[in-house]
Each structure stands twice: as C-alpha cells, then as structure tokens.
Amino acid sequence: MSIYNALYGRDGHGVGPNEPEKKGFARFCQMVGRDLGQLLGTNLMVCVLCLPAALGVSLGVTLLSLPLTVVCSAVTGLLTGPAMVLLADCALRSLQNDPSQWLPRAKQTLAAHWKAACGFGCIGTLVLGLLCFVSAFVFEAAAQQGYYPGLAILVFLALDFLVLAVLATLCAAVLPLQLPAPDSLLRRAGRLLAVAPARCVLAGVLMLAGIGGMILLFPVSVFWAVLFGFWLPGLAAMQTLFPVLRQEYGVEVRSIPRPAAPDKPLTAQEQKKRSRANWWYYNWGIVAVAAMVIVGVAYVAHG
C-alpha cells in the first residue's frame, strides 16, 4: 500500500489549513517525502527494464558494430518504452496527489498503452543507439588521426542528444494521459512544445543531465541508478511540464480534504506524538535511503 494512503485526509507536513499548494522546490520535497516508497519501487522496475538496452547498446558501441547496435537498440527498446511510461506515470501520480496504490495504477497504465509505449521505445532507443555509435565512431576516428574532434562536431552531437531528450520526455509525459479523443503521440508532444517551449526544453535538459550522465558513467553509475538515477530527473522533468499538462489536457489535481475536528482538544503530549508519527509517515523513505547510502559507502570504503 502506498504511504500516501495513510496520509490521505491528514494535514501534511508543514501545510497549514489555509496554505495554498506548494510550488517549486518545496513542492518537490513534499512529493519526495510523501511518495519516496513508490518512487524507489518504480525506479527499480525502470532499472530492470532498461538494463538490456544499456548492455546491448554499450556492446554494439564498444565493438563499433553498426548492425549489432541497430539490432540491440531496436529489440531492447521494446522494454525501454514501457519503462519510460512507468516513470512518467509515477511522477504524474505524485503531482496529481493520487492516493491510489501505485502498483495497480502502473499495471493499468501499461495495459492501456503498452503498444504505443513499445513503438515509442523502439524508435527512441534506436535513435539513441545510433547517436551513441556516431559519437564513438567520431572520437575513435579522431584518436587514430591524433587530434580531438572540433567544437562544431561536439555542438552538433550535443544538440542531437538534446532534441532526442526533449522529444522523448514530451512523448513519455503525454502517453499515459487519458484523452477524450484519440490523437497521435507526436502531435500531442508538439502541442506542448508549441505552447511552452522553454519548459519543454528545460524538462529535456533535466532528463538528459540525469540519464545521460548515467550512460556516460556506466557501469560505475549502477549504484546511483538503482537508488536515484531515474526518478530524480523524471520527477523534476514532469513537475516542470505539469502546469502545461494541466492547462492543455486538463490533468486534475486532487485536493486533500481536511479531517474533522476532534471532539476534545489534544493534550501537549498527544500533539507531540501525532507530530512525530506524521514526520515518520513523510520521511521514512528518506531515512531508509540515507541508511542504504551510508551502508554502501562504508562497504566500499572498507573493501
């Protein structure tokens, strides 16, 4: 059961009775503290689904084999697409204040959109694999000639990766939405880009920085990927796009109903006990992750 089920109907941590919805970094911290359990669970599933793509594409790029890169990218993309849809749906669930259990919602989303997700993942991963192959080929050819690739080539490759990140982020954001009328995926993504280009580019930059950094540091980044690698940039990117999704597609946000006032006022000891329980409801996930990080660092330090 989601941690939010226990909180639905309660006052949130640091939220006053007449306080408006939190914005920016405060809202991000509120979602992380409230839904870290489902974020970590989704992150683990995304890691498992993306692992074949990471291994297959890296093998083709390392061997500088274009046929192997194309085949591995296209085949493993059938898993990468659903993974990105799960990630976006998980972030949207937190942004919507949805108190439902996260795993049944993830199953419903995949059941409704798995065909489109597989197609989106196949094409996106294929383009990513080709870009990685071209980058590796350019650097290898330059190294054999004894010089470094020029600035124009680096800028061109960086822009290609940025365009791919923006389009992939927008497609992943609009794919899980339940729309009254069917529409093509690229048209929905283009609509967001036309309405708020700055937000769309920023969301793509966040995803590129988070996931692209893991790709560059793979396999060293495996530990980071399992804990934070996908949900952290994914939640930040979806939060950036969420105002546009609310405006263009009417994505609803559930308000948290205030509980009925108690029959008699709480004593100071009861208020302290309730406050302590409320803090643990919101922050148990952060404490668990901090403990995992400390144990991991201690294990690596002492060999």
Regions found by a protein language model. Give the residues of each.
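Helix-coil boundary and N-terminal low-complexity module in membrane systems
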Residues: 1-136, 140-142, 169-303
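Alpha-helical transmembrane segments of multi-pass membrane proteins
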Residues: 155-167
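Juxtamembrane helix-entry segments on the extracytoplasmic side of multipass membrane proteins
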Residues: 147-155
